């Protein structure tokens, strides 16, 4: 581990910062020397665990309504709302994410995991991202939303395009692609909403169409935005934690072997996978008043990035944070955020991670990286993780008829 001695000259909006392998060294300098850091363009960033929590505990000063991305305005979905509007919308959407609804998916998610492994198990090799990690959450979310299996690839592409649009510099081409994708998604979603109003089913679309809190229901446009948030949030984050976390298990063979021998160690491993990968790199809050925050002057109207990944490697909270340890306890990471905006889908994400990792450990116990080359990361400033991860294993027979 090298120690950065000079102030990092970085652009926190440039996706390459999160993908070139230097971010965590830069974070270390920021936490030690400038807990609320300004990058080369003047963008403020809360980098310590305490600074992130302090901002999240004070939404009156650190508002979500200006939008969670540094260079884009707020959108009409709950992640860009403050309470009480946020709380009302959250209650409406939460009807589709109750513990019972999530646990009712155990068998179907388990079958899906086996189906994905069955598709590659006889080959003895696959791309873990493309073949295992990426299809799982999209299929789960697609199933919950009630979309047809044939429509999942389309949803996956829309999700990728939208996240890339939210995670990159805004230029005319990016804006146009974002608008085209959103228009296609809106047309698709409104058609589904119309069908569910006429013939309700038990899927998430039907729940959102018919859920009511304090006498209020969501409009069609509100359902479009909230399902879009569910699609993006449920896809990318779980995908990157599964692939990036599995990479670390494979690079720490003693810990992989311990899990193969004792699956009861898995809950701790899942939490360390979440901390280590920190797939949501940051979110922004907008200052409602001038203040001095952890030694840095902030102005009303400016945005500050809450650096969740940096917080998850804060030495004052996590002992030996740069070592991956499945026995880490306590592990109070903020991979799902903190406070009123704590991730609504955290139970579903943990379930998917557990069910797939259980099966990979059992069915592909000698899984290993195809080579020692670094796993390439997606150059994105919002949600980032492995782009590709070739793996090899001893071929085996499918388990589903």
Swiss-Prot record:
Protein name: Steroid C26-monooxygenase
SUPFAM superfamilies hit by this protein: Cytochrome P450
Catalytic activity, as annotated: cholest-4-en-3-one + 6 reduced [2Fe-2S]-[ferredoxin] + 3 O2 + 5 H(+) = (25R)-3-oxocholest-4-en-26-oate + 6 oxidized [2Fe-2S]-[ferredoxin] + 4 H2O
Family: Belongs to the cytochrome P450 family.
Classification via PROSITE patterns: CYTOCHROME_P450
Induction: By cholesterol.
Pathway info: Steroid metabolism; cholesterol degradation
GO MF annotations, alphabetized: cholest-4-en-3-one 26-monooxygenase activity; heme binding; iron ion binding; steroid hydroxylase activity
Cofactor: heme
Organism field: Mycolicibacterium smegmatis (strain ATCC 700084 / mc(2)155)
Keyword Lipid metabolism in record: yes
Lipoprotein found in the keyword field: no
Superkingdom as given in the UniProt entry: Bacteria
Residues annotated for heme binding in this entry: 343
Keywords: Cholesterol metabolism, Heme, Iron, Lipid degradation, Lipid metabolism, Metal-binding, Monooxygenase, NADP, Oxidoreductase, Steroid metabolism, Sterol metabolism
Result of knocking out the encoding gene: Cells lacking this gene show a slight reduction in the levels of cholest-4-en-3-one-26-oate, but the concentration of 26-hydroxycholest-4-en-3-one is not measurably affected. The levels of 26-hydroxycholest-4-en-3-one and cholest-4-on-3-one-26-oate are drastically reduced in cells lacking both cyp125A3 and cyp142A2.
């Amino acid at each position: 581990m090298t120690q950065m001695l000079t102030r990092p000259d970085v652009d926190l909006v440039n996706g390459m910062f999160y993908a070139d392998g230097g971010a965590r060294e830069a974070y270390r300098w920021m936490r030690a020397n400038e807990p609320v850091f300004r990058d080369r363009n003047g963008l403020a960033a809360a980098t310590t665990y305490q600074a992130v929590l302090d901002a999240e505990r004070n939404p009156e000063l650190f508002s979500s309504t200006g939008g969670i991305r540094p260079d884009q305005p707020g959108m009409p979905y709950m992640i860009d709302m403050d309470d009480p509007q946020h709380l009302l919308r959250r209650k409406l959407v939460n009807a589709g994410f109750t513990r019972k609804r999530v646990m009712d998916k155990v068998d179907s998610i388990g079958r899906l995991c086996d189906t994905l492994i069955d598709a590659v198990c006889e080959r003895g090799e696959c791309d873990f991202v493309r073949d295992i990690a990426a299809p799982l959450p999209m299929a789960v979310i697609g199933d919950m939303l009630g979309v047809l299996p044939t429509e999942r690839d389309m949803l996956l592409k829309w999700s990728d395009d939208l996240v890339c649009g939210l995670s990159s510099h805004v230029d005319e081409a990016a804006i146009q692609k974002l608008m085209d994708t959103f228009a296609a998604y809106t047309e698709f979603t409104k058609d589904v909403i119309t069908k569910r109003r006429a013939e309700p089913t038990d899927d998430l679309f039907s729940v959102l169409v018919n859920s009511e809190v304090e006498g209020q229901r969501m409009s069609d446009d509100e359902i479009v935005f909230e399902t879009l948030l569910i699609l993006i949030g449920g896809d990318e984050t779980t995908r990157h934690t599964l692939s990036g976390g599995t990479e670390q298990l494979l690079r720490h063979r003693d810990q992989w072997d311990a899990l193969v021998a004792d699956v009861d160690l898995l809950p701790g491993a899942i939490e360390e996978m979440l901390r280590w990968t920190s797939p949501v790199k940051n979110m922004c809050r907008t200052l409602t008043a001038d203040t001095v925050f952890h030694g840095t002057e902030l102005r009303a109207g400016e945005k500050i990035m809450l650096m969740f990944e940096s917080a998850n490697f804060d030495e004052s909270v996590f002992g030996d944070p740069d070592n991956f340890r499945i026995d880490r306890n306590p592990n109070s990471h903020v991979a799902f955020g903190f406070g009123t905006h704590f991730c609504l889908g955290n139970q579903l994400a943990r379930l998917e991670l557990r069910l797939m990792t259980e099966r990979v450990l059992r069915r592909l116990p000698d899984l290993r990286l195809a080579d020692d080359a670094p796993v390439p990361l997606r150059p994105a400033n919002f949600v980032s993780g492995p782009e590709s991860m070739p793996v090899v294993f001893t071929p085996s027979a499918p388990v589903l008829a």
